[in-house]
């Protein structure tokens, strides 16, 4: 049993690529969590995709024992949290399990957008924040400049910021000493009824669901009968332990400590992040605060390129769901693309990661339809039906235009950091996406002058390709972060694409009336280049309701029917041409247009011109 005053729980906050995982590696090495042979780069990022993109997706924890300069041995629990906005709820749960945080800032790049979002969350949890300036051995490093930036932008006192270089191992001892000295120990009562917060969970093929917990009061031991207060299920604990990053079984997890439990649970669904665990007998009267159901924000259709892969896709999505309860899916069928799934995600990065994991880990080729968001549609009262409010995320379910009273769409508050040179292009991009500018300030010194601009933007304009466009016009220098700010009324319409007068369901979009014509024209032009010519003329149209707003025509291929006539009377040729004309008219009426798979994929990648 560890004395409470000797425990330190902390997380590491950093923007992507500022060296968070490398610093974690060094801390593990110095405290002897792994032998030199077992040490690998980015120990805590288990998935390949986490290592490749240099991002952390699932929260991980490590328990380290450190003997400080005062001769005492401290138990340090490091929570490695995701840094991306899509996983903000996971971050907030991980932060709630700690008392302090290391704020890691790259000495060459300074403070970025996502650092800020997570720092503010950390401050809300009343954390003690220890600034760490990393990568000080880079030639472009300006530690003093960054120190001033931390004080200006975040308002933290950075006079005692720890200077380190995680890669070359400079200053790691100083970081550990700062953790012991500055971060407060947790509070908790060993004899009170058990209260433990569920920080994260994942599926292990041998153990079932592994649950990461932070014990607030009481003690977790093997053989305890526990109840999940929000989920309402009961389980028998069959293993308790911690990670050093290796799995180590322990006799108990006491108050203030972070560890894991398993209870032969088969589905991650039952172990929801943020739930409270207590004993079945004499349990805690009420759960911990801060639990909420995670709602998907962005939706899109996932279809296999080869229809025969549908079963494989169903299986793979089921397996992914075991590990990631925050994404939801339901079956959907489309006339153009066959059977597939409609899936909901926490945000764009989440969508990309799931897509990439499906194609990489399960070897699937997928078509994804245009991402859409959740619209709240108020339907007017009619003779036969009452007025009601419905939520729609699939353009196929769009109600009759005449019944719609008001449509509300989700808006976000976006914070963009960019070097001054690219500001004009970025403001134009936000303007084109119906953004409303709310603030513009400058931060940093002469050599690192950057603009911080905040915009209110409709989420539906951001899900498409906003992030890619932002990165390309700023040559990768701009950083972007967003939070949701509720719904607002919008003049939205459903745009259908008709090929040979038949609507193609997979290409319908919900767009704002002001940009409908432009989008429709772009889509028609693109399809005109992609659909092969047939023996008859094919009209491609974009329509809102019954009104056609854009049209392109694919010219027919002409077979030379008069080639075999040699000399002779003109009426012979006329007869053949008339016959061809009639055949074409009949063909146009009954002919089927085949739209190649590539056309779908390319048409859905609009906005990249």
Swiss-Prot record:
Entry keyword annotation includes Hydrolase: yes
GO biological process: positive regulation of translation
Alphabetical list of SUPFAM superfamilies matching this protein: EF-G C-terminal domain-like, P-loop containing nucleoside triphosphate hydrolases
Keyword field: Cell inner membrane, Cell membrane, GTP-binding, Hydrolase, Membrane, Nucleotide-binding, Protein biosynthesis
GO terms for cellular component: plasma membrane
Gene3D superfamilies linked to this entry: 3.30.70.240, Elongation factor 4, C-terminal domain (3.30.70.2570), Elongation Factor G (Translational Gtpase), domain 3 (3.30.70.870), P-loop containing nucleotide triphosphate hydrolases (3.40.50.300), Translation factors (2.40.30.10)
UniProt keyword Protein biosynthesis, yes or no: yes
Family from the record: Belongs to the TRAFAC class translation factor GTPase superfamily. Classic translation factor GTPase family. LepA subfamily.
PANTHER family: TRANSLATION FACTOR GUF1 HOMOLOG, CHLOROPLASTIC, TRANSLATION FACTOR GUF1-RELATED
Protein name in the entry: Elongation factor 4
Lineage of producing organism: Bacteria, Pseudomonadati, Pseudomonadota, Alphaproteobacteria, Sphingomonadales
